[in-house]
Curated annotation (Swiss-Prot):
Gene3D superfamilies: Skp domain (3.30.910.20). It comes from Chlamydia pneumoniae. Residues 1-21 form the signal peptide. It comes from the Bacteria. This is Skp-like protein. The keyword Signal applies.
Length: 171
């Protein structure tokens, strides 16, 4: 991806007839943090995280309760062998369920985060193209691909404004 961006950048620089190319850049992180779309996507991700955490806490409480019973010698001695074995089995099963739940949590959060970023990048591309054509720029690059550029070429604020306008129309 970075090689492709760099190659595209070199191609744009090489294809301009003048020594000075008219370029801009966008800060994707700012778009994610400051745009209404980015804020909404972040809120949804946080809500998803909170739901997972709440459910995990319930399982943790139950695991702790069973663990404490298993560690209490007096309690364990008062149980029949079958009840004692059943409690151990319940602890093992619940531990496995908890581990599977945590794995599902991380996988779901990662997938949601990737989708969130992909969605934002698609919207930023549309907004960047609008700014590029309006301001007659050769290209708008991702800030991470730019090592040095003249002051005043940051188009992030303009792109965030377009993202917010588009978000308001859609909602």
């Amino acid at each position: 991806m970075k090689k492709l961006l760099f190659s595209t950048f070199l191609l744009v620089l090489g294809s301009t007839s003048a020594a000075h190319a008219n370029l801009g850049y966008v800060n994707l992180k700012r778009c994610l943090e400051e745009s209404d779309l980015g804020k909404k996507e972040t809120e949804e991700l946080e809500a998803m995280k909170q739901q997972f955490v709440k459910n995990a806490e319930k399982i943790e409480e139950e695991l702790t309760s069973i663990y404490n019973k298993l560690q209490d010698e007096d309690y364990m001695e008062s149980l029949s062998d079958s009840a004692s074995e059943e409690l151990r089995k319940k602890f093992e099963d619940l531990s496995g369920e908890y581990n599977a739940y945590q794995s599902q949590y991380y996988q779901s959060i990662n997938q949601s985060n990737v989708k969130r970023i992909q969605k934002l990048i698609q919207e930023v591309k549309i907004a960047a193209e609008s700014v590029r054509s309006k301001e007659k720029l050769e290209a708008i690059l991702n800030e991470e691909a730019v090592l040095a550029i003249a002051p005043g070429t940051d188009k992030t604020t303009e792109i965030i404004a377009i993202l917010n306008e588009s978000f308001k129309k859609q909602n």
